[in-house]
């Protein structure tokens, strides 16, 4: 497959992945209070716990998934990660307590590994003289996804509801 096509596909994948991690930023406090019954005096604490839990677990799991990718195959692990991320967002739409939401975000962190898989896959396809460009594009679209996420999440929550935004994100990642 042509490296430019691979870069385009992976870039789209990265934008969705990165946006999914940050999409709940605009409505997380409201989701916690209005949907999950958190008292306003505890919403800041729960927001911090819920949001950070993904990244704590992800930091632990990403190298493990990377090692599995070396054994099982990079494409298989990328598909696995996308599917598990999609499931995690579906679960975000059905949780009923802040603890369940925290576990969902931890599961999301457990599912992490898409970024290292995408990097590894790109190194297989990019010509050596274009690898730096490809990795730079990938980093740029990851940053763009992180910026797009709150805008997308806020818009989805505004027009479709906070719970529905999780289901739509799940569909986008699937």
Predicted regions and their residues:
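Symmetry-related core transmembrane helices of the 12-TM Major Facilitator Superfamily/SLC fold
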Residues: 165-174
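Conserved MFS/SLC helix-loop-helix module at the cytosolic interface between two early adjacent transmembrane helices
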Residues: 60-92, 96
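Extracellular/periplasmic helix-loop-helix junction of adjacent transmembrane segments
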Residues: 31-58
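Paired small-residue
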Residues: 88, 99-107
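Small-residue (Gly/Pro/Ala) motifs that create kinks and tight helix-helix packing interfaces
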Residues: 29, 145-157, 161
């Amino acid at each position: 497959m042509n490296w430019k096509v691979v870069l385009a596909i992976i870039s789209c994948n990265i934008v969705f992945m990165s946006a999914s991690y940050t999409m709940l930023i605009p409505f997380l406090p409201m989701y916690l209070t209005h949907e999950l019954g958190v008292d306003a005096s505890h919403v800041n604490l729960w927001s911090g716990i819920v949001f950070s839990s993904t990244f704590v677990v992800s930091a632990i799991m990403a190298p493990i998934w990377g090692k599995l990718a070396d054994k099982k195959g990079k494409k298989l692990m990328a598909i696995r990660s996308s599917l598990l991320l999609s499931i995690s967002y579906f679960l975000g739409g059905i949780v009923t307590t802040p603890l369940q939401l925290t576990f969902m975000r931890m599961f999301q962190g457990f599912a992490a590994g898409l970024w290292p898989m995408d990097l590894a896959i790109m190194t297989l396809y990019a010509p050596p003289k274009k690898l730096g460009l490809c990795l730079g594009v990938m980093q740029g679209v990851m940053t763009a996804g992180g910026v797009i996420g709150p805008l997308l999440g806020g818009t989805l929550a505004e027009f479709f509801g906070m719970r529905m935004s999780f289901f739509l994100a799940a569909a986008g990642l699937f």
